[in-house]
């Protein structure tokens, strides 16, 4: 049998599937990182050797800021391409939820490089809002406030808005709307209000239950009507500027996204027809990362669509709904934090110990009068070739089962099981 090659490692670990050209195996058999296509690669083995010379030992977390920059550009270009294709004339805003990765260096890099791509930040609590206000000083950048809201959280957001920040308070419970109305009246400010709508559509994958009718957050249809009635009575209809939905993280099936977008588009149409001039539709997170490189929906670690397909469906759904109802196109907000940051860091740690499967020594002979099952298994291994590989594997499995049955009945010695095991494993 031939020796193991670099190509075999690339195929085994499917690095070309999940690496997205950021990660590859170089000619030395080492993992290489290429932050941008066409730029210089970093050999991780050589990098770690250099760090050890400097007395830096593993575990080490390596960050590649250029990958963050490239991911921002990738998503932005996908929206531009979709806008050109479907006639989308409004704006797209990319929002980074800092809960995804709160490391200062990460958030600063995203804010710095993302200025020309309408990058904003999302806060899910008062402490996160403090961090967002401190790190993102661009007055044209959007700040989305989600999560549980108490009086202090709402007051901080409204005071920041009074200072010129573009802040949107997204209502997830009816009592939050009343709280926002009371505090804004006291501070004499017209708040930018968003409403999170609880869609019937749900996502797919590990976080499927976080969306749909069973979701903990958002207003259902009856609660939405109650909220709209409250805004009308409070003469705050002009304050409702955003609707938001989120059907789960790491969505594996594009069909679920299509259904949610279709449903959300109708909510936008209905609100416009009721006299609420919503300017933004926040489609939330959910854009998946293909961790295993299979590009399938059968695994929670993958998804069956590309970023471009996700963006195309998002843009086309809203453009189509607006065209049919003669309505202005809304600005689209996305909160795809996972897709932005997943590839940019690598954790390198020391391998403490390894285990290996027993392998048949090619120089070893079976000896005289071997058991017929062992002899047959040896012949399968000795005569194995590529065209009959699967057939040989099936034959080996059958012999293995027969050997275990005989061993269980006391008709086969442990020594024979010992001989047959490395021969079978060699076939793998």
Model-derived regions, located:
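Single conserved hydrophobic/aromatic residue that forms the stacking wall/gate
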Residues: 417-428
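Polar, glycine-rich mid-to-C-terminal structural blocks
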Residues: 340, 349-410
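Low-complexity, highly charged intrinsically disordered N-terminal segments
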Residues: 26-39, 45-102
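Phosphate/diphosphate-binding loops
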Residues: 172-175, 307-318, 331-334, 370-374
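Glycine-rich beta-strand-to-loop/alpha-helix junction loops that act as flexible
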Residues: 247-248, 281-291, 334-339
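Active-site-proximal beta-alpha core segment in soluble small-molecule metabolic enzymes
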Residues: 86-280, 289, 305-309, 322
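N-terminal basic/disordered segments at the start of proteins
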Residues: 2-37
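Short glycine/threonine-rich loop-to-helix capping motif typified by GTGT followed
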Residues: 251-259, 290-307, 339-354
């Amino acid at each position: 049998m031939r020796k193991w090659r670099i190509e075999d490692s690339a195929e085994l670990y499917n690095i070309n599937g999940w690496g997205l050209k950021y990660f590859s195996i170089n000619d030395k058999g080492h993992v290489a990182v290429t932050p941008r296509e066409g730029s210089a690669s970093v050999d991780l083995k050589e990098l770690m050797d250099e760090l050890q010379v400097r007395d830096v030992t593993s575990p080490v977390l390596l960050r590649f800021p250029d990958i963050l920059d490239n991911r921002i550009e990738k998503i932005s270009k996908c929206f531009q391409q979709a806008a050109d294709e479907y006639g989308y004339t409004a704006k797209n805003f990319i929002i980074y939820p800092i809960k995804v990765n709160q490391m200062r260096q990460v958030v600063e890099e995203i804010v710095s490089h993302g200025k020309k791509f309408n990058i904003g930040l999302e806060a899910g609590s008062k402490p996160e809002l403090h961090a967002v206000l401190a790190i993102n000083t661009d007055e044209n950048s959007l700040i989305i406030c989600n999560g549980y809201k108490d009086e202090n959280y709402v007051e901080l957001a409204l005071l920041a808005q009074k200072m010129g920040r573009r802040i949107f308070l997204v209502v997830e419970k009816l009592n939050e709307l009343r709280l926002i109305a009371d505090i804004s009246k006291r501070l004499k400010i017209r708040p930018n209000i968003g409403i999170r709508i609880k869609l019937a559509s749900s996502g797919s994958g590990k976080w499927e239950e976080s969306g749909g009718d069973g979701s903990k957050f958002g207003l259902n249809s009856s609660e939405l009507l109650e909220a709209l009635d409250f805004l009308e009575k409070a003469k705050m209809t002009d304050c409702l500027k955003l609707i938001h939905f989120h059907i789960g993280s790491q969505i594996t099936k594009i069909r679920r996204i299509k259904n949610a977008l279709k449903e959300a588009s109708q909510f936008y149409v209905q609100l416009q027809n009721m006299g609420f001039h919503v300017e933004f539709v926040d489609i939330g997170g959910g854009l998946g990362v293909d961790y295993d490189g299979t590009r399938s929906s059968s695994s929670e670690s993958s998804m069956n669509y590309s970023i471009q397909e996700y963006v195309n469906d998002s843009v086309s759904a809203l453009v189509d709904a607006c065209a049919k109802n003669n309505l202005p196109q809304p600005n689209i907000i996305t909160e795809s934090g996972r897709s932005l940051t997943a590839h940019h860091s690598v954790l390198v740690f020391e391998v403490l110990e390894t285990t290996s499967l027993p392998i048949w020594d090619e120089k070893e002979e079976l000896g005289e009068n071997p058991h017929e099952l062992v002899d047959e298994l040896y012949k399968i291994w000795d005569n194995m070739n590529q065209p009959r590989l699967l057939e040989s594997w099936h034959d080996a499995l059958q012999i293995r089962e027969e050997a275990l049955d005989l061993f269980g009945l006391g008709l086969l010695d442990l020594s024979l099981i010992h001989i047959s095991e490395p021969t079978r494993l060699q076939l793998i």
